[in-house]
Amino acid sequence: MATNGHFASIGNSASDTTAYEHGVQVIDENKEFNPNLSQYLSLENVTPSGFNYHLISVFGSQSTGKSTLLNHLFGTHFSVMSELERRQTTKGIWMSKNKNESSSMASNILVMDVEGTDGRERGEDQDFERKSALFALATSEVLIVNIWEHQVGLYQGANMGLLKTVFEVNLQLFLKDKNTTHRSLLFFVIRDYSGMTPLQNLQKTLMEDMARLWDSISKPGGLENSNVHDYFDFQFYGLPHKGYQPEKFVEETQKLSLRFCDGQRDPNLDARKGEFSDGGVFLPEYHRRIPADGFSRYAEGIWDQIVNNKDLDLPTQQELLAQFRCDEILREVMVAFDETIVPFEDKQSQAARLGEPEILGGLGAAMRSSRTKAVKAFESEASRYHKGVYQRKRAELESKADTRLKTLFQGQLNAAHKSGISEFSEAVTAAVKSGQKKGTGYDFAEIVNEEAKKAVDKFEEVARATVVDGTSWSDYKQELALYEKELAEVSARLRRDEMRRLASRVERWVQSRLGESVGLEFNALGSGRAGGGAPEKGDQPTEKKFWDRVWNVFVETVLDAERRFTDRASSFDASLEEVDVGLWRLRRKSWGVLRAKIDEEMIEGNLLLKLRENFEDKFRYDDAGVPRIWRPTDDIEGIYTRARESTLTLIPLLSKFRLDETSAPPPLDRWIGHTPSSATSADEEDLAPIGGVDEEEGKSLEEEMTIVSDAKRQELTVRFKKAADGVYVEAKRSAIGGMTQVPLYFYGLLLALGWNEIIAVLRNPAYFFLLFVCAVGAYITYQLNLWGPIIKMTEAASNQAVTEGKKRLREFLESSDTGRQAIAMSTPGGSGRGGEEHEMSRLNQQGKSAAADEDVDDL
């Protein structure tokens, strides 16, 4: 004989279906729960079925053929008792899936074979009987009560004690859940039914017994008037004797098996009148609403409460199960969620570490897809559990997912923000440079507006592509407003920068124009002749009006620059305040340019050169601008004195910037104006202080307009006089040199004495050709006006040769004793005219001595 006890270890480690041929022992005889129940359900493909499964338990006395009944009804292989012995076969509680492949039966029927009652092995120990009944009632939809016909009407034989226990634990189980009335089906299968007693009579007897049992149990407050039909439905079926009518038994069990299908309650039947359904046994209200994937965990929790004699609270157990399963499902769906989202999180965090925010392609689609899949997967698996727990855990899942997705969303918007700002700045700069290279006018405001619109459109495109519908954090209006605000700030900064560049270009233009115009005024300074220094038309400029002309040129140039600046700034969409600041800066910068140009022209060397040129113009040229050729009869001293005094009047004139019309400095402070109220410290930091305009500078306008100090004026006067004296001495020499003339008779004497040589030259072709070449060279030299320089160079070379000869002679004499004695006896004095010595290295460009110009050479 084989008993179920032999298979008690099955299911502990095996993972294939053959190991579960006899089912799985859910609870062994030692009241231990088998943790591999979930594995069995998974192998039988019950786990994914959700609520689409049914659980049946069978009760009855020991050795009454419960396992045999189940094997015939459901095709299971529960071990049965040998007919040769009568002892306990089923130990604990076993479970097996329905093997009957009849299409009329419900799918996924799980059958529990409960250890029989009233067995001699346990004797009077009814603890397991009560615990197993409680477990079966807490988990099963249908309770099959297996009794023999001859036991109907008996107390012990008809399992009345067991049924009383069932009624009591039913109230215990569902008392705490008063919102729902849980129902179960008690299906009485009457074995060895002979048919002599009508089944209706047996039903009546059993129902009377049920009513008495219900009335006999202790009921909690509020349920004193309840009856058994409030909690239980009843069905009855009679089976013939298996031993005496085996074929009939098989036939009837097959018919009975067809009733294990989904059914509907017939409202026309009244159980109190003995009207019972003979249709499908699985009504929706019987189902315990425990999803198949959580059944093993639920059953384990139920048994743990039962075996530890704790108050069994099914709603609490359902919540605990829901908590456990929802946590498991949440972790599972988050694994799939992580597979999609983690790569994007890694990319984003790496880009953030590198300081190079990157717009992640496909992020929005991945976020929406992963969130939807996670929520749907969770909903599909967890929605079958306790609604409150499910909703709470779903909210937790959405919160976890949304927290991470929000971070990605914010990071994406941040990347779009930073890259957009950078691209906007680069695009505006590139467009401006392109317009400058083409040489065509460009509208800066239009460029900024177009690029800003593109930047906003791109930002919105990225944001819309990343939005996850149905989430509160997907509203990017605030981020868009911040982005537009920064775009406006960057636009303002670019406009300020462009206006600075415009101002720089205008300043360079002013510098160029002033450099030319003011330079011309200085070049024409004090020209006293109608030659190259005089204007082509009209009268020559008056020296007294020099600063007036400079100021007028300056003001006109700056006004023209202001018009250019204002016209160009209008295309920048600049405000009036920005234009005012730009014009104010332009005037200050322009004054700095003018003052720098004046200082450049008025440095000591340049000014001394200007004074000498002014003096030479007045001294060397007459009033008609014709060069003077000095003769001994000319009033060289008078002309020299007038020219020198006239030039000396320029020194005090140039020392201070004063207008001839007002005899006062120009109104620089009024012309520049007050500092605009909108000017910032950045607008003033690169501006040089101006005396008389900036109070904190400590300089007056008079000091600002002082070009040459008094000490410099005196030094300049002395050096100019020395230079003028040199010019005067040179003029005096040229006049004296012209007094030496060759007598006319000398030319006749030269012709008479050299006649033979003349004839010899004319008759000799070689001499004649040489003479011809010399004549042509002399003519060309005359036409190029080079005779003067040649004569001067020759004279200087000869003088230099004489000087060098004297030097060598002196060195020779100094090297001998006789020479040293002769030198010692000689009187001091120089050689040459007036004691002057001329060296080639000391000649000026006219071939004259540069001794008189030694101060000018300090430029």
UniProtKB/Swiss-Prot annotation:
Major place of residence: endoplasmic reticulum
SUPFAM superfamilies noted in UniProt: P-loop containing nucleoside triphosphate hydrolases (SSF52540)
Entry coiled-coil feature ranges: 442-500
Cytoplasmic-facing ranges: 1-741, 787-859
PANTHER family recorded: PROTEIN SEY1
Function: Cooperates with the reticulon proteins and tubule-shaping DP1 family proteins to generate and maintain the structure of the tubular endoplasmic reticulum network. Has GTPase activity, which is required for its function in ER organization.
Protein's recorded name: Protein sey1
UniProt organism field: Aspergillus flavus (strain ATCC 200026 / FGSC A1120 / IAM 13836 / NRRL 3357 / JCM 12722 / SRRC 167)
Phylogenetic lineage: Eukaryota, Fungi, Dikarya, Ascomycota, Pezizomycotina
GN (gene name): sey1
